[in-house]
Each structure stands twice: as C-alpha cells, then as structure tokens.
Amino acid sequence: MDKVMAQLEGLVAHYEELQEMMADPEVINDTKRYMEISKEEADMREVVQKYRKYKSDIKEIDDNKEIISSESDDDLVEMAKEENSELEKEVAKLEDEIKILMLPKDPNDDKDIIMEIRGAAGGDEASLFAGDLLRMYEKYAETQGWKVSLIDSEPTEVGGYKRVAVMITGDKVYSKLKYENGAHRVQRVPVTESQGRVHTSTATVAVMPEYEQVDIDLDPKDIRVDVYRSSGAGGQHINKTSSAVRMTHLPTGIVVAMQDQRSQQQNREKAMQILKSRVYDYYESQNRDKYDAKRKDAVGTGDRSERIRTYNYPQNRVTDHRIGLTLNKLDRVMNGELDEIINALVLYYQTQQLEKMAEENA
C-alpha cells in the first residue's frame, strides 16, 4: 500500500492544479480545453475524496491512540478504543476501494463499440440464438441509456442471423461489454424438434472498441460503395430514396452498412468512420494470420466445447464458466438484466489485478 500512497500524493497535487485551472478565466473561455480539464478532474474526484477521508481517519486513529496511552479517565479511554475499532474497519474498506480505483485503466473503457454476433455451431438454431443475443444486448443497452445502430446483417430464412454487426454508443460502453467476447452456448429444444430433445448450439460475440479518429488512409479504389433503399426507421421519406449505404473494403472483405442517418451523405460519412475503425483494427495485427489468431482468441472457433457462458432454457439457468457464476433466472437475463453477471466479471478481473499488484509490491 505504501507505493500506492506515494502515487496518491502526486495525484492529489495534480487534482488541485486542475481545480485551479478550472477557475482560470482563460481556460473557462476555451470551451474545448475546459471540457477536457473538467473531465479529467471528474475522473479523479472519487479517488481523491476517498484518499482524503483515509488520511483523516488515520489521523483520528493516531489521536485516539495517544488518548489511550496517556489518559487516566477510563471512560475516555474506552470511548477512544470503540472509535478506533470502527475507524480501523473504515480504513480497511477505504484501502480496498482506493486500490481498485488506482488499478491501471483500460484506455478503451470510455469508447463506443462495434459488436459482431455470428451463429456458429448448430445451423438454424445457432442463427436464432444469435438473434436472441442481439435482442438481449439491445434491451441491456436500453437500461443503460445507450444507442444501438445496425451496421450490417446477414439474416436467415428462419428469422435469425448468420451474422449481425451493430454499433453501441453511450457512456463507458466498452468497459461493460468487453467481457462478452467469446463463444456463447445455448441448450434448449428447437422449435423444429418434434421429439422434444434438447439441442446444443453456439453463437460467437466479438466486441471491438470504435476509434473516433484513426490514422489510416483507405484507397478509394479499394472500397466498393453500394446504395439502396433503407428499410429502417425514418418514416416514408427515407424509403423513397436510396439513402442507405453499404461499403466493402475489398482487400480485407470487411463490410459496413449504414441506414440510421437521415441522408445518404450522412450514412456515407458514418459508414466510412466505422469502416476505417474496423480496417484499422484489422491492420493493427499486421497481417491476416495474426488478425485471425487474435479473433480466435477473442471468440473461439465456435465449437460447441468452447464457451464462456451457457444458457440452459429447460432449467432457466445461465452459467458464466470463467468465474463459476450460476444464476437461475435466464428469462430475466435474456430480457437484458445483465448487471449481476457484468458486475461479477468486473470484480473478478479487478481481484486478479490486485493480486498481481500485491505480488509486485511484495
């Protein structure tokens, strides 16, 4: 904890500098700079407040120890001991909270995401489950105040998706949904099953952060652009014109379709932004082999034996295999109630980081 405390002293000094800057008329008049500084100040506020409370409690404990060692009044000594008992519990709690707040932040946590869901092993049933997962994430996004926009989809005749990609925008989307990367297994009786037998199918989920601005130039010759009539929201007007846009990056085969915006030009701009983000993510791994290996690590091959989570419909049970968490409320989870699972995953990975930090500081 000593190393963490040394870092905190520097952090508090920087926090106080930020507060002074926010009161500077020159900064106040520069909206962009003021917003950047105020966001940094807000991000640091909780840990600074907890550290100040921690220091205040430590001082009170020391003062009480002095009373205990020097005071002759038994009642005062007893009162000081009782206070210290409570303060020591509070200090231990604050230490744990501060350690978590001081863990290295994932630089992508504040970013929006591109989520790709694919029906994998299991044929039609896998594609139906891919659609169920999409609806689950859409409902969860609604509870968080996030927006979901369709990028591209490959629907199946039975009503599911062979593949569907969406963009989810809002506050700290990646920080919560990054744990959804992987193979999701479903066990249920398909609607086409006449014997009532339970089948096992799989869908894979890939979650990629959306980069607002990426340092990549795409050769226009490498991009095929198709326009078509939108079938989504927007009223009659949007269906009368070919406002929807599909862009294909020919060297990588990456496809982005956008129809959420009001005009073709807006759809083009948004599609290009997303395409750049996805192509950038692709080339980050230098070549296709590394990209495929990275994606396989993230989502698995889709084989039934690989999974991060199992959704068992007959028993209304969902199990996250990474942390051994089982909940007997699958119906509520599929209705978007994901917080209990996501919070448990966050705690699990925070605990792992804390253990690593303790080893490094030992």
From Swiss-Prot:
UniProt keyword terms in alphabetical order: Cytoplasm, Methylation, Protein biosynthesis
Reported modifications of this chain: Methylated by PrmC. Methylation increases the termination efficiency of RF1.
Annotated Gene3D superfamilies: 3.30.160.20, 3.30.70.1660, 6.10.140.1950
NCBIfam families membership: prfA (TIGR00019), PRK00591.1 (NF001859)
PROSITE patterns: RF_PROK_I
Homology family: Belongs to the prokaryotic/mitochondrial release factor family.
Modification type N5-methylglutamine: residues: 236
SUPFAM superfamilies assigned: Release factor
Record-given protein name: Peptide chain release factor 1
Database matches in InterPro entries: PCRF, Pep_chain_release_fac_I, Pep_chain_release_fac_I_sf, Prokaryotic/Mito_RF, RF-1
Cellular compartments per GO CC: cytoplasm
Segment forming the signal sequence: none
Organism classification: Bacteria, Bacillati, Bacillota, Bacilli, Lactobacillales
Compartments where found: Cytoplasm
Function: Peptide chain release factor 1 directs the termination of translation in response to the peptide chain termination codons UAG and UAA.
Domain of life: Bacteria
An annotated Gene Ontology molecular function: translation release factor activity, codon specific
